[in-house]
Amino acid sequence: MRVVSMVPSWTETLLKAGVQVVGRTRFCIHPPKMITNIPIVGGTKEVSWDLVIDLKPDLVLLDQEENPLEMAEECPVPYLATHVSSLQSLQTELARLGEHFKNPQLMELSVDCLDILEAPVPQWDFQKIPAFMEWVKAPSQGYKQVAYMIWKKPWMSVSRETYIGSVLEKLGAKLVEYPEGEKYPVVELEEMKDTFFLFSSEPFPFHKKIGELKELGIEGAIVNGESYSWFGVRGIEFLRETLLKK
């Protein structure tokens, strides 16, 4: 089956499972050696349908959190839209993809995800932060909550209603509580007292702005955003290594 994947984490997952991916977004950068010769048809928010049609795909793969509704509505070929908003929904969607593609490796990943869901939740350790890259300022006290930051100007965080939030909670972190329905709330850092900040390396490249962050005087760390936000094979490998020590 010829697949155009508009979801970076699914692109990597499908390729590693042996599915034939014939088109991708410019953000589909993994696995590096496998994506080199796969044509780019757009980004996660916009696409050239002419380029897609030229590739003669059997299916376009979308995700409700990654791609806009218009992309599904305008898609000129059959499509499948997943909806990954938590570890639980990831397990469900992996099983669905495994069945759709009749692919045992995808089914095996869904079982791995189930193992992760059933694993005990550890105590969050601020001295051993998973996917740690660099200190903005090391914690000088105990913190009861963390805020995972994804954007600057405006400052944006994530709630527990997201896949990232689900991952953090599984790792034992207590997230800042936001109003229900606000998945990616705009926040004011100076108003967030007694909060330790995790600055993601993507989509905003906080690791390249470490000097500016240090000037704020807040305590926090830079973490690898791919580990926390790329669901599928990359996220599962990260959680297996962290939670199951496999």
Task: List each language-model region with its residue ranges.
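N-terminal ligand-binding lobe of clamshell/alpha-beta domains
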Residues: 1-246
